[in-house]
A protein has these predicted regions:
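A short helix-coil junction within the Rossmann-fold of NAD(P)-dependent oxidoreductases
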Residues: 14-25, 36
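C-terminal substrate-recognition "lid" of short-chain dehydrogenase/reductases
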Residues: 18, 101-127, 132
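Active-site helix of classical SDR
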Residues: 12, 48, 56
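Catalytic Tyr-x(3-8)-Lys segment
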Residues: 85-104
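Active-site loop-to-helix junction immediately N-terminal to the catalytic Tyr of the SDR YXXXK motif
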Residues: 37-46, 58
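Residue(s) in the substrate-gating loop at a strand-loop-helix junction
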Residues: 31
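Alpha-helical segment proximal to the catalytic Tyr-Lys
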Residues: 17, 61-65, 118
Length: 133
C-alpha cells in the first residue's frame, strides 16, 4: 500500500520545478475499487486506491496555488491483459454492456493534461461505463 500511496507524491515533489514551469498537470490512477466494494480487488488494493484518491485531493489543494492541477481517474473494467478471471460475469451489470478500452482511458488522461480542463482540479473521474450508477 505504501508504494501506491506515496510514490505519486514523491514523484510530483521531485518534479516540482518542472511542473511549476510548465503549469503542469498530475493525473493519478485510482480505481473504482477505491470507492466501492469490488469482487476481485481485495482489501489492500482497495484501501491503497482510496488513499490515493484522498491524496489527490490534498495534492490539488497544495499544488493548485503553484499553478499545478492534480486530478485522478478511476477506471472500472477495462479490457487489458490484467483482467481478473470472472470479469465477463460483471459485463451484464455495466449499463453500457461492455468493457472499456485502454484508448478510452488514455483520452480522459489526455484531456486532464490539456487546457480543455484548465479549471478542473482535485477531481476523480470514474471511467466505468456506468457500473456504479
Amino acid at each position: 500500500m505504501t508504494f501506491r500511496s506515496f510514490a505519486p507524491i514523491m514523484l510530483a515533489r521531485g518534479l516540482l520545478d518542472e511542473l511549476k514551469a510548465a503549469k503542469g498537470s498530475v493525473v493519478n490512477v485510482t480505481s473504482i475499487a477505491g470507492s466501492r466494494v469490488h469482487p476481485f480487488a481485495g482489501a489492500a488494493y482497495s484501501t491503497s486506491k482510496a488513499a490515493l484518491a484522498a491524496l489527490t485531493r490534498e495534492m490539488a489543494a497544495d499544488f493548485g496555488p503553484l499553478g499545478i492541477r492534480v486530478n485522478a481517474i478511476a477506471p472500472g473494467e477495462i479490457d487489458t491483459a490484467i483482467l481478473s478471471p470472472g470479469t465477463e460475469a460483471i459485463i451484464p451489470q455495466i449499463p453500457l454492456h461492455r468493457l472499456g478500452t485502454p484508448d478510452e482511458v488514455a483520452k480522459i488522461i489526455y484531456v486532464l493534461c490539456t487546457d480543455t480542463s484548465s479549471y478542473v482540479n482535485g477531481a476523480e473521474i470514474h471511467i466505468n461505463g456506468g457500473q456504479h450508477v
